[in-house]
């Protein structure tokens, strides 16, 4: 399997059988389990069973000395899958019939009968209440305030049935109740439901709700949604009703998705004029977060500077003067840099991640699934025509390429290409000159490179590249080292080959290819030997995570700084992952699948460079080892962001995001002349 890590083994054991006979006189007893026998003289007397005594010597009716013997290897272990469900069902029936209940919860005007042990096992809140020194621990009736009685009944039902239905009519009472009772699973379900309901008319309300109940992940998603869809959000009634603090939180974001800063100013003025009498006192506080120096001179003078509310406020006039100075004095701009002069950089929208092929349940697979980080959903797309483990995956010209791999029986040189617009794979791509599995694939200067791998006979150092215009592969300079399970990355116009195995042992060496000189040159090695690692470029660093060294699968990670030619460690992932995929989607770094030394993984985790932490953030539909990952823009023909195909509210929630383009920057001389004319 291309030296992909794998695991599994079996053990078999046997048990001997013993038999004995007994009777009067000189009856004999024998046993045979491994070629041995025993006979006894003076057999069993009347009433003797003829069975071996507890000394295990196989002599009927004979009392022997106490001898420690290992237990018989013949045994049957059983774990019931039905038992938990049956037990819960019976406990719920007892509750319904008010049998053996030892506590009554008074919630609102309703009495809810229950068993303390069940509530304590499910809820940390109840566990603290009933097992501590609180007065409620000795009461048979407990009053619980500040919670909706219908929500409480649903949550108690969940404790007994493991089933709950979250819907629009109950989510706003269920989530606070689940927070109070510390039912984390229900909190997560409620937040997931609300994420799927996000649209421009309700995202601000959901954001405030998440903030109130400390649902950090929902708050983050609602913030991202608001930023991505600000042009629609600013037209909603919720936006006009925002308190000033929340308005400031939104417009100060670098990731606000607007065509120009004019939209931000217009949004602020719409909010202000919705209630001028109460809000005009906040104008300067809000306007300082509008990046006035980035406005066009015409708009700054003709619209902002001439607005009566702006002109009547001294602090606002100062902000306008600051912007004029910035536009009039380009030579002084380096000294005038600050939050208001920093261009907004909205996250690239509509990126989705594809997980392609891999190894699952003892065989190579052809399945492909797509991950949308904004909805945290994995959805199956069209499978490849061949099963491929150890496949190389890259995106070229908005098409996803799957290169080589192993189909479970043979090594492949065939290639398939996926078009997200049609959700179809085509096989009309020219094959590589060599069969390759555990191959590294990347795109550089419009060419698709296939690096290293193995062909079933040997580990390869061959490198070839594909020209999509001619549909041909051509060889380039080989690497200095043979590498299978190699990771590749493109940074600064170079192609890096990182780690892998030379067929004998894992490598920590790194080399990079210069296409201008058609030459590979070694750079500083990693601190750890790694094969079947994950690799991606993130914030101008090359990240290398997981893989396997000489002994075990790895969770450790490190990153390469090309400016200093050094590797430095970062925090380890939450799981060991060999055969892991690594990719950057919408400005976040994701580690996908792999093998932890005992099981194939379908979990994914995301890295936060600010906190230097990884966190689990979902699961694929399939466990995948040695699959490839690729990132693409979602197709424009599909309602791809913030929608759930299974949602009953599809018609309300599905809409296309419009791709916005930054206006091209004027040449400095032209801009200066125009600025002087207009100011």
From Swiss-Prot:
SUPFAM superfamilies, per database record: Galactose oxidase, central domain, Kelch motif, POZ domain
Domain BACK positions: 203-305
General function of this protein: Probable substrate-specific adapter of an E3 ubiquitin-protein ligase complex which mediates the ubiquitination and subsequent proteasomal degradation of target proteins. May have a role in synapse differentiation and growth.
GO biological process: negative regulation of synaptic assembly at neuromuscular junction; protein ubiquitination
Record GO terms (molecular function): actin binding
Spans annotated as Disordered: 1-84, 643-679
Pathway connected to this protein: Protein modification; protein ubiquitination
Source organism of the structure: Drosophila willistoni (Fruit fly)
Keyword field contains Repeat: yes
Ranges for domain BTB: 101-168
PANTHER family linked: KELCH PROTEIN (PTHR24412), KELCH-LIKE PROTEIN 20 (PTHR24412:SF451)
Gene that this polypeptide is encoded by: dbo
Domain of life: Eukaryota
Biased composition (Gly residues): 1-48
SMART domains hit by this protein: BACK, BTB, Kelch
Keywords: Actin-binding, Kelch repeat, Repeat, Ubl conjugation pathway
The protein's name: Kelch-like protein diablo
Family matches, as CDD domains: BACK_KLHL20, BTB_POZ_KLHL20_KLEIP
Pfam families recorded: BACK, BTB, Kelch_1
Positions with biased composition (Low complexity): 645-679
Ranges of the Kelch repeats in the UniProt entry: 352-398, 400-446, 447-493, 495-540, 542-587, 588-634
